């Protein structure tokens, strides 16, 4: 059976005005994935925290390097 190490990172928009902008968050995460180079994304999980400024979504990306 093959196995590999799964890695992850979480990302959100800056707190305050625009923190609930999901399209901006998706673009931000896409840019982060591209900067990592050759990776295979396994899963994306969206979370939403409720703050005094309103909803604050974040995404956790689970991935592995394709060179591993």
Question: Where do the model's predicted regions map?
Answer:
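N-terminal acidic leader/helix
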Residues: 1-36
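Short, charge-rich amphipathic interface segments used for partner binding and complex assembly
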Residues: 28-68
């Amino acid at each position: 059976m093959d196995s590999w190490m799964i890695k992850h990172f979480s990302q959100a928009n800056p707190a305050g005005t625009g923190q609930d902008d999901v399209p901006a968050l998706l673009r931000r995460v896409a840019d982060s994935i591209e900067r990592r180079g050759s990776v295979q994304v396994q899963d994306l999980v969206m979370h939403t925290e409720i703050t005094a400024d309103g909803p604050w979504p974040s995404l956790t990306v689970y991935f592995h390097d394709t060179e591993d």
